[in-house]
Amino acid sequence: MEFYASLKSIAMHVPSERVKNAEFQQFLDTSDEWIEKRTGIKERRFASNEEKSSDLGVIAAKQAIERAHLTPKDIDLVVVATLSPDFLAMPSTACVLSAKLGIENKPAFDISAACTGFIYLLSVAKAYVESGMCENVLIVGAEKTSSVLDFKDRGTCILFGDGAGACVIGRTKRLKESILDVQISANGNFSNYLYTPRTLKPTPFNSKEEALEPFLCMKGNEVFKLAVKTLLKDVETILEKNALKPEDVRLFIPHQANFRIIQAVREHLDFKDEQVVLTVHKYGNTSAASIPMAMCEAYEEGRLKKGDLMLLDAFGGGLTWGSALVYFGG
């Protein structure tokens, strides 16, 4: 191989509006203590009515491109992961975001892998770069999860937040600046554990109407148990496959869904506190944006430096899951 795929830059953006747990008490049977005890979340950000996922994503994307010392014209491919796209079916949020960046005549498409979206993005970008098809790939996890939440359901609406994270994936000849390994998987037999239904209206050819509201639905207890079991196995597998141990990893950056899930994986694998990046208390579950946002915070705080090895893992609707070993090449 002449070169490897490398994570060249990272950036993030969140809306300005902070929503603290206590604000949910105004319309739900809940409390700050109840939410924080069960999730570790203290607050989250919600976008305005005018903002869409692409608006959040484009701000992060511009900064990621600048940090990679590139211009939008240098980007060969744009891929967006989101469960809250700007439009229901088309155009893709990646196409909308590309236009806002001034990128024309370059491929752009979305990935639907829910909270595992960023790991899927890494897999796609790595393949495109290492095959020689692209030199610079822009990947963006952008979420306005508040647009798909039922604010009458305290089991879901308290968990999520809005935000975006973006990375530029380029080339390197150095293994220790590369995306070392990515593994992704899915099992559609559990698709009813976490999903967003679509309302079907009657037509002249079909009188049946499904009056389901298009809000995120989740079997919380089942998802929690399966997430912990699956992530433990997945992380152990990728470490063993690459002859690595937890102490070889500079930072463990898991999907920020729930502090209890993160803690269960951390304790089982014996990661030290200083190895683990946590942002769930500040932003809640930002789905496909959570890992790049957490990565960016670590970078901006000086915890993540060039050549550092990161272990990433995520679990989401589909059900989907994945993990990655990534040397920071920025």
UniProtKB/Swiss-Prot annotation:
Keyword Protein biosynthesis: no
Any one GO CC term of the record: cytoplasm
Subcellular location as annotated: Cytoplasm
Annotated metabolic or biological route of this protein: Lipid metabolism; fatty acid biosynthesis
Function as written in the Swiss-Prot or TrEMBL entry: Catalyzes the condensation reaction of fatty acid synthesis by the addition to an acyl acceptor of two carbons from malonyl-ACP. Catalyzes the first condensation reaction which initiates fatty acid synthesis and may therefore play a role in governing the total rate of fatty acid production. Possesses both acetoacetyl-ACP synthase and acetyl transacylase activities. Its substrate specificity determines the biosynthesis of branched-chain and/or straight-chain of fatty acids.
Quaternary structure, from the entry: Homodimer.
Protein name, UniProt field: Beta-ketoacyl-[acyl-carrier-protein] synthase III
Annotated source species: Helicobacter pylori (strain HPAG1)
